[in-house]
Amino acid sequence: MTAHLPILIVIIPLFVAMAARLLVRLSVPFTRGFVLAAALAVLASGAVALAETLVRGEPWRYYVSGWPPPWGIELVIDPLAGGLIVLVAFFGLAALVYAGPYLQGRTPREQGSFYALFLLAKAGLLGMCATGDLFNLYVFLEISSLAAYALIAFGGRRSIVAALRYLIIGTAAACFYLLGVGYLYAMTGSLNMADLAVLLPPLMDSPVVILALVFIVAGLGIKMALFPLHGWLPDAYSYTPAPVLAFMAAVMTKVSAYALYRILYFVTEAAGPVSPTLQVLGWMAAAGILFGSIMAIAQRDLWRMLAYSSVAQVGYIVLGLAVGNVLALYGALLHVLSHALVKGGLFFIAGGVSWETGVRRVSDFVGIAKKMPLTMGAFVAAALSMIGLPPTLGFFSKWYLVLGCLEAGAWVFVAVLVVSSLLTAVYFFRVIENAYLKGLPQPGARAERPVPPGARRFRLELPASMLVPILVLGIGVVVLGLFNEQIISNVIQYALPWRLP
């Protein structure tokens, strides 16, 4: 069974997605338990696969049906892919746990559709992490994207427009990527990443190869919301249900960034014409960092504030990839983990506050810390990590990015990182000031939930299934910050291109 872990990581959510749509007709509680058990199994499988890869000291290559590439489909799990698989699986489980109260008012059919679509999106992302060829990366990208379009529409009437817009832009992105892959296949006759890494270097001066890379970078840039290709993100993030949004914000853009990193550093080895590509990406990332931070300050709705903040944070990751030295790559890969934990937690918090009080506007957060102290405590921890204050994980990821930029002599990028941190402090401290330093809680869209006669007066500020993921992530950004050196030395340093065969 262990020998087949790479394929099981992808197959389990696919089969459970189909089963959930049928089982929900018999019993909703059983279906939910079944889905959660499957999500836990995927997380455990991913952790075992990552550990096995680290112990082996080489990538774990799995040939589907025993056919080796280029005729068969190859799955490859190395420390980079394994770490991201664990991250996707963890957030998939956390979001499913969190979604319980959100789904209580839904019909069994709607709940079954939600579970099926969510698991399809998760399977697509896991497949993107594990695949060893460019075409199947496209297939898994489309599986996750199509499911995401439908999940966004679960948010209500306004979310349907956002989902349609994302569908149109996302389809264009997929076409760009597929066109680029087609050009590479026409030039090399292979889609396998390992084969392309050997076949492409002699062809790197070809205009066709250069055009192919431009299309691939453009397609993945749209998917990861890299400025100025981010137009779909603010509306999509503003109207998506919180469990889905936390999952999307935490891992969907990160997996696209992973795919970009894979192609630039492992397939093309960042040589020849790719170097100008990295320079362009660096300036796009720097512009996105400033643009996202400034636009976040201008927002009055917390969800849109966090959405524009994501544009800036994607810029941090791409900036590290563009600078490209060891320290910058440490910072970029560590920021993938940091931002996933922080932004996933922040959207869990935003959803919990909205679910309990109806509050979404920053100005309505006045005094809310008195009503929801644990939730807002986690918010403060996440905000400090976003700003980049020690000992949170966000401080260390930004620290490595700054060191990498200094080593490269990129002083402008250093200034961008510092200014962005100050801007981030402005829009997060505005929320913290309202929550802790001003007055009593303001009435939101709903009145406070009444306590039934005869019930205990004490109750948690949120249902346990919502509060536990929030607290785990809030504590996690601090604890993992304290262990950042171990994360780098035991996982991230083995994910650099020159450490992998």
Curated annotation (Swiss-Prot):
Keywords, comma-separated and alphabetical: Cell membrane, Membrane, NAD, Quinone, Translocase, Transmembrane, Transmembrane helix, Transport
Gene Ontology molecular function: NADH dehydrogenase (ubiquinone) activity; NADH:ubiquinone reductase (non-electrogenic) activity; quinone binding
Top class in the EC scheme: translocase
InterPro entries from the UniProt entry: CPA3_Na-H_Antiporter_D, NADH-Q_OxRdtase_suN/2, NADH_UbQ_OxRdtase, ND/Mrp_TM
UniProt main location, coarse: membrane
Catalytic function, reaction form: a quinone + NADH + 5 H(+)(in) = a quinol + NAD(+) + 4 H(+)(out)
Keyword NAD: yes
CC terms in the record's Gene Ontology section: plasma membrane
An individual GO BP term: ATP synthesis coupled electron transport
EC number of this enzyme: 7.1.1.-
Subcellular location field: Cell membrane
Topology term for the membrane: Multi-pass membrane protein
Coiled coil: none
Keyword Cell membrane: yes
A Pfam family that the UniProt record links to this protein: Proton_antipo_M
The family this protein is said to belong to: Belongs to the complex I subunit 2 family.
Protein task: NDH-1 shuttles electrons from NADH, via FMN and iron-sulfur (Fe-S) centers, to quinones in the respiratory chain. The immediate electron acceptor for the enzyme in this species is believed to be a menaquinone. Couples the redox reaction to proton translocation (for every two electrons transferred, four hydrogen ions are translocated across the cytoplasmic membrane), and thus conserves the redox energy in a proton gradient.
Subunit structure: NDH-1 is composed of 14 different subunits. Subunits NuoA, H, J, K, L, M, N constitute the membrane sector of the complex.
Protein name (record): NADH-quinone oxidoreductase subunit N
Source organism (scientific name): Desulforudis audaxviator (strain MP104C)
Gene name linked to the record: nuoN
